[in-house]
Design a protein with these regions (language model features):
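Alpha-helical solenoid repeat scaffolds
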Residues: 1-183
Length: 183
């Protein structure tokens, strides 16, 4: 491609991305066809899927992951999509797609999914592991923490364990919060 063609493609790409980010999917897709050979074309597809994560199907996500396994944005899109599934309480979908992650919000959704599909005991055991961490956990954990606190797994020993960990980690706000559970 010559300079003029590259400049035109770059301009078209920018416009298509802008449309995608504004939720104007039809306009973005109309421009997408002319960008099939453009090196950043996968990022336009990323933007299109991102703009409608709540409506994006498992098949669409899987197809994107298969087409672009090495694209740096692929794991991010997948995590964002999984979080949307958690927000929508799509437990079977989430449960079938669990994997080891350091993302605390996803971990909470995965445990909630495990509970939601009936593996209650294992989910409550995993909840204990999440709850004892000496840091505040994401809001996504709150529903399963609520259930867990109503079980025999919740004890003064565990409260003190987390309290001590929070103090050692300098998490004073969490330590103050935990005092409500101390008797």
């Amino acid at each position: 491609l010559g300079l003029a063609e590259r400049a035109a493609a770059r301009s078209t790409f920018k416009q298509a991305v802008e449309y995608a980010r504004k939720g104007q999917v039809t306009k973005s897709r109309a421009l997408q066809g002319s960008l099939s050979d453009y090196p950043l074309a996968p990022y336009l597809e990323y933007e299109l899927l991102s703009s409608r994560l709540g409506q994006t199907s498992s098949a669409e996500i899987d197809a994107f992951r298969e087409r672009y396994p090495d694209l740096p944005a692929t794991p991010l899109l997948y995590q964002r999509w999984l979080k949307v599934q958690g927000q929508r309480r799509q437990w079977a979908t989430l449960y079938s797609r669990r994997y080891d992650t350091t993302n605390a919000e996803l971990q909470c959704y995965f445990v909630r999914a495990q509970y939601g599909v009936g593996e209650k005991s294992a989910a409550l055991d995993a909840t204990t592991e999440l709850w004892v961490r000496p840091k505040s956990q994401p809001k996504a954990c709150d529903p399963i923490f609520s259930v867990w606190r109503g079980t025999e797994r919740f004890s003064q020993d565990i409260v003190w364990h987390r309290f001590n960990g929070a103090m050692q980690a300098g998490e004073r706000v969490l330590a103050r919060y935990l005092q409500r559970y101390m008797t």
